[in-house]
Amino acid sequence: MKFSAAVLGFASLASAISVSYDQGYDDAGRSLTSVSCSDGNNGLITKYGWQNQGAVAGFPRIGGYSGIAGWNSAQCGTCYGITYNGNTIYVLAVDHAGDGFNIAKQAMDQLTNGQAAGLGRIDANYQQVATSNCGL
């Protein structure tokens, strides 16, 4: 009963958003200086000492989010539950995206049951959640 109430609560508070993928976020060795949330007071290097994407908690469930305006955004390191066809993954926002979410292909494959390449871009629901959902 509690589980179904939690799922219904998530669904009722979620908003629709576009989700695509970029294989740059799949590169564990890519330096965090390549993303908007690199350094500065809100940067992931500054806050956690991570130097590359593979060190990020929850990797490869990372990506860009349109709510991150650019370098040192207060939205850096926020966690989102993204739901597609009843499947939810949690993604840590590490970069700016022009439209919705642009996440690692591996993360989108987890979200779409291996269909990221075939689908390319999807409409999903999302909600900001506690960072503990993203391994922080």
UniProtKB/Swiss-Prot annotation:
It is found in: Secreted. This is Protein SnodProt1. Belongs to the cerato-platanin family. Keywords: Disulfide bond, Secreted, Signal. Disulfide bonds join C37-C76, C79-C134. It holds the Pfam family Cerato-platanin. InterPro entries: Cerato-platanin, RlpA-like_sf. Induction: Produced during infection of wheat leaves. One of its GO terms (cellular component) is extracellular region. It comes from Phaeosphaeria nodorum (strain SN15 / ATCC MYA-4574 / FGSC 10173) (Glume blotch fungus). Residues 1-16 form the signal peptide. CDD domains: DPBB_CEPL-like (cd22778).
